[in-house]
Amino acid sequence: MPFKIAHISDTHISPEHNRNNIRKLKSLLTYIVDRNYDHIAITGDITSQGSQEELRSIRKLLKHFDLLHSNRLSIVVGNHDIFGGVHRAEDLLSFSTKCKRVNYKKQLGLFQRAFKELHTKDDFNLLNSYPYIKLVDQVAIIGVNSIPPYSRLGNPFGSNGRVDDVQFAELSKLLSHPALKDYSKIVLIHHHFNKYIVQSDGIAEWLYHRFEALTLELHGYRKLLKLFSNEGVSAVLHGHTHIIATYMTLGVSFSSTALIPLNNDNQKLHFNEVTVLNQNNVTIAPVVVDPQKSPAHTSENIPEKW
């Protein structure tokens, strides 16, 4: 039987910014849950600022749909979940200083504890919270943290990516484990592996997105890509760029999506349907949802503050 994953990313939930995104996410989850997908994967930037208030709101929504179960939902962290983000142009110059002050370990811990039910107990003798693995049917879902701590040169705005040497070694050991030889390996990570294309309607917007593109890189992506290819990874699911895309590199299929993508009608909601037929056969197809036609387009069961 095909194993179907609903891939969501970059929901950016916030009571202060993007106030409608909680309703949009509810519409999207209603659509997905009603269609009985085997699993849901959310690849980071679930929150806008990484605050406890935002995390509590998302927990409440996921609990409403009975999704706080390891076999139903997998989540990886994004840069907004650690460092937050810029919502006003005047805050751009001070944002690097804000990132420098972030307690990285504390923020990552808050994120992990917010979704503690989703952690797996599959015993592969892993040392840290990332990478993680869960075995669902004949699919091995592997979560990777691509968000490094602040660095003045390497990660001044918190949005660049890197998988450090310790995590890479664990990931390499995990992907080559003999117990996974009959499983389709699906990797979840926040950062992208394709070229970020700047799209804009004017010079000011172009300059902003051009600056953004220079600070959205995944350092060491070629090394990761080679590992994924050599170890037979079937697909990599990611977000970060807010671009809907499917692409293939070195025999590995990639899924890129966002709740409200830059390259589509921003009144519609989006996710990718990842269908795993076997180790050598994975298909990825974008799905568009009109929230106006969704039964969840209502204030029912939404906290009043939203």
Q: Where in this protein do the model-derived segments appear?
A:
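Conserved beta-sheet core of the metallophosphoesterase superfamily
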Residues: K63, V102, D201-L277
